[in-house]
From Swiss-Prot:
Subcellular location: Plastid, Chloroplast
One of the GO BP terms on file: ribosomal large subunit assembly
Protein name per Swiss-Prot or TrEMBL: Large ribosomal subunit protein bL20c
Example of a GO MF term: rRNA binding
Family the UniProt entry places it in: Belongs to the bacterial ribosomal protein bL20 family.
Keywords carried by this UniProt record: Chloroplast, Plastid, Ribonucleoprotein, Ribosomal protein, RNA-binding, rRNA-binding
Gene3D superfamilies reported in the protein's UniProt record: 6.10.160.10, Ribosomal protein L20
Species of origin: Lotus japonicus (Lotus corniculatus var. japonicus)
Role description: Binds directly to 23S ribosomal RNA and is necessary for the in vitro assembly process of the 50S ribosomal subunit. It is not involved in the protein synthesizing functions of that subunit.
């Protein structure tokens, strides 16, 4: 059988992986086996954190809404929670998502106060 020389192909594959990990520190950007392991680890983390980011932002929006509603409660001397607020929003068929309501709570607190007054009555 004839000999097949494929050193170029392997070098090309390793170079492609090395370009991906070129910004990593130390041996993670130099040693071939470590490079391939770190590439897999980086891609797994990126995939996991794409979903985690959505979860964390939703939690952030909820805490901002709850804080905004809490500020309004101090003005009116009544207790009004996030869950009651969202329930009343959907009951009145006001289709505002949590991101928009959180932005209203931060930048226009009085608008959130007006919305809360409208849906509570």
């Amino acid at each position: 059988m004839t000999r097949i020389k494929r050193g170029y192909i392997a070098r090309k594959r390793r170079t492609k992986i090395r370009l991906f990990t070129s910004s990593f520190r130390g041996a993670h950007s130099r040693l071939t086996r470590t490079i391939s392991q770190q590439k897999i680890k980086a891609l797994v983390s990126a995939h996991r954190d794409r979903n985690r980011k959505k979860r964390e932002f939703r939690g952030l929006w909820i805490s901002r809404i709850n804080a905004g509603i809490g500020d309004n409660d101090k003005k009116k001397n009544i207790y009004y929670s996030y869950s009651n607020f969202m329930y009343n929003l959907y009951k009145k068929q006001l289709l505002l998502n949590r991101k928009i309501v959180a932005q209203i709570a931060i930048f226009k607190g009085n608008c959130l106060f007006m919305i809360a007054n409208e849906i509570i009555t």
